[in-house]
From Swiss-Prot:
Gene name of the record: atpH
Subcellular localization: Cell membrane
UniProt subunit comment: F-type ATPases have 2 components, F(1) - the catalytic core - and F(0) - the membrane proton channel. F(1) has five subunits: alpha(3), beta(3), gamma(1), delta(1), epsilon(1). F(0) has three main subunits: a(1), b(2) and c(10-14). The alpha and beta chains form an alternating ring which encloses part of the gamma chain. F(1) is attached to F(0) by a central stalk formed by the gamma and epsilon chains, while a peripheral stalk is formed by the delta and b chains.
SUPFAM superfamilies in the cross-refs: N-terminal domain of the delta subunit of the F1F0-ATP synthase
Keyword list, A-Z: ATP synthesis, Cell membrane, CF(1), Hydrogen ion transport, Ion transport, Membrane, Transport
Protein family per UniProt: Belongs to the ATPase delta chain family.
Protein name listed in UniProt: ATP synthase subunit delta
Membrane-topology annotation of the record: Peripheral membrane protein
Domain of life from the UniProt record: Bacteria
Record InterPro entries: ATP_synth_OSCP/delta_N_sf (IPR026015), ATPase_OSCP/d_CS (IPR020781), ATPase_OSCP/dsu (IPR000711)
Record carries keyword Flavoprotein: no
One GO cellular component, as annotated: plasma membrane
GO molecular function: proton-transporting ATP synthase activity, rotational mechanism
Length: 178
């Protein structure tokens, strides 16, 4: 089975527990902290895959390293360790945070532009396109792409809205050829 699908199942289960216990904010904070800790300490993942350490020793390491996180997050980490799927934690974190954003009506977007967009322009894009995709707000990352010449290309999930000059020129070219 695909690793992304497996991670999504664990993320969904953790998300449901967070909702049931009314701890969504706390668990979100903990998941972000775990993701960051693992990203900054690659040796920790290597240590957990070291074959000479027993499962109990590895569990003790997780309990000690993540003593400050909530019980549901710690239990999820221990379950992943027991099932030899601890490597899924970064993907699980991404999936969990996507579920949280979705529940809050937030979508992630990438705006490609020839120049940096102002906060006002980003806010205007968010206001217009959030409604189009049925969300309350968009969190937009601006990437500079001088090849666009002008205008903006916006990617939300797997949808692309191309309002760039280069995109318009390409559409005109296709019309003239076809």
């Amino acid at each position: 089975m695909n690793q992304e699908v497996i991670a999504k199942r664990y993320a969904s289960a953790l998300f449901q527990i967070a909702l049931e216990q009314g701890q969504l904010d706390r668990i979100e904070e903990d998941v972000r902290a775990v993701r960051q800790a693992l990203a900054e300490n690659g040796e920790f993942l290597s240590l957990l895959s070291y074959p000479k350490l027993s499962l109990d020793q590895k569990k003790a390491l997780i309990r000690e390293a993540f003593a400050g996180v909530s019980t549901p997050v710690q239990n999820t980490l221990l379950l992943l360790l027991e099932r030899h799927r601890f490597g899924l934690v970064p993907e699980l974190a991404e999936q969990f945070l996507a579920l949280v954003d979705d529940a809050r009506g937030i979508a992630k977007a990438v705006a490609y532009s020839a120049r940096p967009l102002t906060d006002e322009e980003l806010r205007a894009l968010s206001d217009v396109f959030a409604q189009k995709v049925g969300k309350q707000t968009l969190e937009i990352e601006n990437i500079i792409d001088p090849e666009l010449i002008g205008g903006v290309k916006l990617r939300i999930g797997n949808r692309i809205y191309d309002g760039s000059v280069s995109g318009q020129l390409e559409r005109i070219r296709r019309q003239l050829i076809g």
